[in-house]
Swiss-Prot record:
Keywords carried by this UniProt record: Amino-acid biosynthesis, Cytoplasm, Diaminopimelate biosynthesis, Lyase, Lysine biosynthesis, Schiff base
Similarity comment text for this entry: Belongs to the DapA family.
Molecular function terms from GO: 4-hydroxy-tetrahydrodipicolinate synthase activity
Record-listed pyruvate binding positions: 50, 208
Gene name per UniProt: dapA
GO cellular component: cytosol
The organism's place on the tree of life at top rank: Bacteria
Function of the protein: Catalyzes the condensation of (S)-aspartate-beta-semialdehyde [(S)-ASA] and pyruvate to 4-hydroxy-tetrahydrodipicolinate (HTPA).
Source species taxonomy: Bacteria, Pseudomonadati, Pseudomonadota, Gammaproteobacteria, Pasteurellales
Keyword Lyase recorded: yes
SUPFAM superfamilies documented for this protein: Aldolase
Enzymatic class: lyase
Protein's name in the database: 4-hydroxy-tetrahydrodipicolinate synthase
């Protein structure tokens, strides 16, 4: 391992990308970075799924990451979303991030083209060999249509700068298996807010969180409590947030979280780029109810 675990722990926000009339609003990114620093978030992922990376150009993608690093100014670790379903493009993006100031990269399993496990191994090997930046694998089969198997994760863990995985399967049985195959030092970050607390109780180091966009202080406190072994207090916070954990996926992420952030005044409009469309009117009462239960409104 080439990085220490504390850089990748606790409540790491999967940061949304504010837009005004469909264009990236960098001032609002700056505002969000300040919000997360003040709230005690343990890290920021820029340009992940929640950040709408798939609807931005490569130039926009890299600029958002660079500006996020600039705004953070060393006060909070920034992890860059850098994946693609084309290995060559993922390598290109990763190389562009060398020297930018991110602490590592989060690289999603190639989507749509459904590679074999050997193809996935070679994909990640090529990316890792193109950089010295620490790499975190990102497994989210519900979106990609392809599952990175624990056995393949174990193989990939032998590559020095592949240091961890974001598991968004919600399947807690995978955690001990991955730890067995990849080693106890291999970082396990939950990509599923609903099971994030339980994954940390089982030995995971944290959660890359959508809910954190709205409830940053609560998520940070919950993670700190569970990692310190204070499970009852952590569970009390988690129960207030549990409806958000689920309902922020009532429509495709980041549609609900952008609308919720707008309602909370964190961004000026819930603008998205097609093919993503605004939250439907029928879904809005569900999100409002979850925000109320969380004590956010």
């Amino acid at each position: 391992m080439i990085m220490s675990v504390p850089l990748f722990h606790g409540s790491i926000v999967a940061l949304l990308t504010p837009m005004t009339h469909g264009e990236v609003n960098y001032q609002e990114i700056k505002n969000l970075v300040e919000y997360h620093i003040q709230a005690g978030s343990h890290g920021i992922v820029a340009m992940g799924t929640t950040g709408e990376s798939t609807t931005l150009s490569i130039d926009e993608h890299v600029k958002v990451i660079k500006k996020t690093v600039e705004f953070a100014d060393g006060r909070i670790p920034i992890i860059a979303g850098s994946g693609s379903n084309a290995t060559s493009e993922a390598v290109t993006i990763t190389k562009l991030l060398n020297g930018v100031g991110v602490v590592g990269c989060l690289s999603v399993v190639p989507y749509y083209n459904k590679p074999t496990q050997e193809g996935l191994y070679l994909h990640y090997k090529a990316i890792a060999e193109s950089t010295e930046l620490p790499q975190i694998l990102y497994n989210v089969p519900s979106r990609t249509g392809c599952d990175l198997k624990p056995e393949t994760i174990g193989r990939l863990s032998e590559i020095p700068n592949i240091i961890g995985v974001k598991e968004a399967t919600g399947d807690l049985t995978r955690l001990p298996l991955i730890k067995t195959l990849a080693g106890e030092d291999f970082i396990f970050l939950s990509g599923d807010d609903a099971t994030g607390l339980e994954s940390m109780k089982l030995g995971g180091q944290g959660v890359i969180s959508v809910t954190n966009n709205l409830a940053a202080a609560d998520m940070a406190k919950m993670c700190e409590l569970v990692l310190a072994g204070n499970f009852a207090e952590a569970e009390a916070i988690n129960q207030r947030l549990i409806d958000l954990h689920h309902d922020l996926f009532i429509e495709a992420n980041p549609i609900p979280v952008k609308w919720a952030a707008y309602k909370l005044g964190l961004i000026s409009e819930p603008s998205l780029r097609l093919p993503l469309t605004p939250l439907s009117e029928t879904a809005q009462p569900t999100i409002l109810k979850a925000l109320q239960k969380a004590g956010l409104i």
